């Protein structure tokens, strides 16, 4: 490994704080626009959206196709990923939960984890400036 690479991209030490967090939200597909608008209203400018399939307590559901009944185990969901400065995370999570909630099983989950660093490839900006 090149010495310069290690120095420039060294991992954060365990006792250092994490100034950024990654929010991953799994939501119902029809709630995407509502969640996107809620995040935009609080100034969140970027996110990654992926179509995913999964199940939790909701499990699958039964459908009939050409006269045969079968169980659909994996349900279509949307996964949102965004990285924000630590101070903006609570507002973003609250916006996601409020906009995604139907009150019914299968509304989804929100996960928040630490992000050690971010690098904008085009400009080499790091940390908050990169997100």
Please describe what each predicted stretch is.
Residues 2-131:
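Positively charged, small/polar-rich N-terminal and surface patches that mediate targeting and assembly
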């Amino acid at each position: 490994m090149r010495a310069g690479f290690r120095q420039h991209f060294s991992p954060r030490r365990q006792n250092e704080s994490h100034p950024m967090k990654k929010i991953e939200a799994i939501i119902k597909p029809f709630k995407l626009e509502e969640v996107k608008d809620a995040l935009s209203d609080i100034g969140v400018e970027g996110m990654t959206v992926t179509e995913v399939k999964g199940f939790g307590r909701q499990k699958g559901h039964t459908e009939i196709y050409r006269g045969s009944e079968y169980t659909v185990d994996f349900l279509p969901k949307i996964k949102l990923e965004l990285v924000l400065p630590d101070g903006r995370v609570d507002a973003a999570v609250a916006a996601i939960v409020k906009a995604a909630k139907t009150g019914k099983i299968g509304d989804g989950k929100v996960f928040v984890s630490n992000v050690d660093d971010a690098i904008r490839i085009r400009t080499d900006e790091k940390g908050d400036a990169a997100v």
